[in-house]
Each structure stands twice: as structure tokens, then as C-alpha cells.
A protein has these predicted regions:
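One-carbon transfer enzymes
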Residues: 1-163
Length: 163
């Protein structure tokens, strides 16, 4: 049976686009919905061109997230993937999708995780601290920023020329 996933992004959506492309021909996983809290995101055009449903998350209120939860349920979403999504997921969604919300984080957690640690902020901190190794972590989402169980980590050796 095909698992339906929703992708959430706040920026330009490069990870969301890549994940969508990767699963485009999959018989096991279908990208059903892409959501963003950024009305200027190029993801909305991407969704139109690729016949993927999209949703603008208009705010970060309880009502906004309740609407989002209802949309997930109506769309029969099995898993939610956070692809550079900057808003904290509320407990109502976390408890409904326990161990079914996955985050992609740009460091080897627990280093450089937590509130405010995302995107270029993480990379700058890694370079400032003269780290020799960095990488990514894929983990389940729980109530605390970047504290969910780790699913996968991939190390990357940094060169001295990286800035």
C-alpha cells in the first residue's frame, strides 16, 4: 500500500523539490501535499507544474495548525517530512502523528541543534567552531527542538577552504 507524505518547508524548498523528484515514480511513497508558511515560496509554482496539492500556512496560531491537522487527515497523510520548516510543530499534530513526523537537520545532532539553529546559522556555527566534521541528521520530531530519536546521520569531512 502506498504511503502518503506531506512535505513542509519555509524557504525556497530545495529539499522538498528533491524529495518530490526522488519519489515521483515510486509505487510505495506518494508526495500528496506540500505546505509552506512562505507565500513567496517557489514551491507553489513547483506544485502546480507537478500536480501536487499545496497549502499556505498563513500563521502560527493554534487555529492555523488545527486547519493544517484537518488537511493532513482529509488528505490521509501517513507521514510528515520537515524540509527546512521553521515553525514549531504543536503537540496536537505531534501526538496525532507520533513517530510519523521526520525532520531533516543540517548538523550531526546533538551538536548545533535547538531553537534558532537552522540553515546557514548552523553552517556558520560549524565553521566558527572550526569543526572538522559536520553532516546531517534525520530524526523523529517530538515536543523539543531537535531532540527526537535519530533515524540516520551522515558525516561529511570539512575542508579548510569551506566558508
Amino acid at each position: 500500500m502506498t504511503k502518503k507524505i506531506a512535505l513542509l518547508a519555509s524557504g525556497k524548498g530545495s529539499n522538498a523539490k528533491n524529495i518530490s523528484a526522488f519519489f515521483k515514480e515510486s509505487e510505495n511513497i506518494s508526495v500528496e501535499l506540500i505546505c509552506s508558511n512562505n507565500s513567496a515560496s517557489p514551491l507553489f509554482d513547483f506544485c502546480k507544474k507537478n500536480n501536487i496539492s499545496s497549502h499556505l500556512i498563513e500563521g502560527a496560531t493554534k487555529d492555523d495548525f488545527e486547519k493544517l491537522l484537518l488537511l493532513f487527515q482529509k488528505s490521509k497523510i501517513d507521514y510528515i517530512i520537515l524540509c527546512g520548516f521553521l515553525l514549531k510543530i504543536p503537540y496536537s499534530i505531534i501526538s496525532t502523528y507520533k513517530n510519523k513526523i521526520i525532520n531533516i537537520h543540517p548538523s550531526l545532532l546533538p551538536k548545533y541543534g535547538g531553537k534558532g539553529m537552522y540553515g546557514s546559522r548552523v553552517h556558520k556555527a560549524v565553521i566558527l567552531n572550526n569543526e572538522k566534521i559536520s553532516g546531517i541528521t534525520i530524526h523523529f520530531v517530538n515536543e523539543e527542538y531537535d531532540k527526537g530519536a535519530v533515524i540516520f546521520q551522515k558525516e561529511h569531512t570539512l575542508s579548510f577552504s569551506e566558508t
